[in-house]
Amino acid sequence: MTKTTIFLSFAFALANTSAYAAGDSQKGKSLAYTCTGCHGINQYKNAYPSYHVPKIGGQNEAYIISALNAYAKGERNHPTMGAQAKSFSSQEIADLAAYISTQKPAH
């Protein structure tokens, strides 16, 4: 194989990898306790600022990843969510999203 062939093979392989690591829902389950403290309580509202906390069970996996990354980067503003999101690695965010997306939506 020539250097060019090796390089092109490597570049092609990288181009086809996912932007996010595949999430492991079992690992996500062990991390989700921190989410259910707010997102698992019916009619829960934050003390400050005061607004309804949404239920997230069954939410789209890609949306959860996007939202948590946005909180971590400060693109979405909420002190609690920003701190929570920053505490997770990219893999842990993917794991959480994989787990939460498989849960039944709250009624």
Named regions from a protein language model:
Residues 16-32, 44, 52, 104-107:
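Electrostatic cytochrome c docking/interface patches
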Residues 6, 47-49, 77:
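N-terminal alpha-helical segment
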Residues 29, 40-72, 82:
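Gly/Gly-Pro-rich "capping" loops immediately C-terminal to redox-active cysteine motifs
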Residues 33-41, 96:
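The canonical Cys-X-X-Cys-His
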Residues 73-76, 84-107:
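C-terminal capping alpha-helices of c-type cytochrome domains
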Residues 2-22:
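Classic N-terminal secretory signal peptides
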